[in-house]
Design a protein with these regions (language model features):
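Short, positively charged and aromatic/hydrophobic N-terminal segments
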Residues: 10-29
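N-terminal amphipathic alpha-helix/helix-capping segment at the start of soluble metabolic enzymes
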Residues: 29-52
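Alpha/beta enzyme core
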Residues: 37-43, 59-83, 93-108, 120-232, ...
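Glycine-rich beta-to-alpha transition loops that act as phosphate-gripper elements at the mouths
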Residues: 56, 113-119, 235-246
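Short gly/pro/ser/thr-enriched loop/turn and capping motifs at secondary-structure boundaries
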Residues: 84-86, 141-143, 266-271
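Active-site proximal loops enriched in glycine and acidic residues that flank catalytic Cys/His/Asp
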Residues: 205, 240-242, 264
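C-terminal alpha-helical cap/extension of soluble enzyme domains
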Residues: 246-325
């Protein structure tokens, strides 16, 4: 009796997911589904561009980043520090707010929700709260302790499909009130951390958080090159992306940087636009011809638009525009 020969199927779960998402787009249906950052950063490294990680601080920030990424057809990472999460009401509040806006705004580009510079307990809390990616910052710990905690966290996160970022060499500057001098990571230590199975690595190369001083000497691109060679195909992360000269950003991407963190520039843009609005008397309830300019929806709009402009500029600089088309 004739039997049909079984054919091997080359339809992977990843391809199936893309197909489902594509059909939903055609049908006008949106499914709220944040993704981890692993694949988008692998694609970025292979394509020699970088995905923007933009820190969020409130609803305006989240909405501004999401809508700009959608308009530019760019994958994006929403980062939140422990301090910002506390300000917004906790990790579950942040996760629910991001998921709710992602759905209501009809966002179709890949979006990851990422804990930025989390300690061990914060990373575990974010995994439980519904984040899709976490950073364990053990750079201030003795190296062997950093290794052990990273190993434990990788096992927990990967069991739930969550990506993990680790750090070697503390990033300088001030983050949530903690000030540290910038360090330059050891390529061999980077290699050991990568061997633990992390998904992407932040390595200090002279970068700092906050505003760069006038006497800043620039990125140690020679060290970055050695780290890239030592760690193979692992996507590298550049923290403190605000204020680094564009030519150094481009050079860093060429040396394997696939994720760039931006926070300070968005904060400065938001503050400047809001201050200007108030200085012009638009929020003064006694001003003539005032149309309720003190309404927070109007008061915060200039800052919201300023964040969008900054995010757009960075997406273009990082080469991410159109990568989610």
């Amino acid at each position: 009796m004739f039997q049909r020969q079984k054919k091997k199927l080359f339809f992977t779960p990843q391809k199936a997911q893309k197909c489902i998402i594509g059909m939903r787009k055609i049908a006008g249906v949106h499914k709220t589904m944040l993704v981890n950052a692993t694949q988008m950063l692998k694609d970025a490294k292979a394509g020699h561009y970088a995905v923007g990680h933009f820190n969020i601080n409130n609803l305006e920030w989240i909405k501004a980043v999401l809508t700009t990424a959608q308009e530019m057809k760019a994958p994006v990472i929403l980062g939140v520090s422990m301090g910002a999460a506390k300000y917004m009401g906790g990790y579950e509040v942040v996760a629910n707010l991001v998921k709710g806006l992602d759905k209501s705004l009809g966002i179709t580009v890949p979006v990851a929700l990422h804990l930025d510079h989390g300690n061990f307990e914060a990373a575990k809390a974010c995994i439980a709260a519904g984040f899709t990616s976490v950073m364990f910052d053990g750079s201030s710990l003795p190296f062997e302790e950093n290794v052990e905690k990273t190993k434990e966290l990788v096992a927990l996160a990967h069991s739930k499909g969550i990506s993990v970022e680790a750090e070697v060499g503390a990033i300088g500057g001030t983050e949530d009130g903690i000030t540290a001098d910038g360090e330059v990571a050891d390529p061999e230590e980077c290699k050991k951390i990568v061997a633990l199975g992390i998904d992407f690595l932040a390595a200090g190369i002279g970068n700092i958080h906050g505003i760069y001083p006038e006497d800043w000497k620039g990125l140690h691109l020679d060290v970055l090159e050695k780290i890239n060679e030592a760690t193979g195909n692992i996507p590298l992360v550049l923290h403190g992306g605000s204020g680094i000269p564009n030519e150094q950003i481009v050079a860093a991407i060429k040396e394997g940087v696939s994720k760039i963190n931006v926070n300070t520039e968005c904060q400065l843009a938001f503050a400047a636009a809001t201050i200007k609005y108030c200085a012009e008397g638009k929020a003064d309830p006694t001003a003539a011809n005032l149309e309720k300019g003190y309404d927070p929806r109007k008061l915060l709009k200039p800052g919201y638009e300023a964040i969008k402009a900054t995010v757009k500029e960075k997406i273009q600089l990082f080469g991410t525009e159109g990568k989610a088309a």
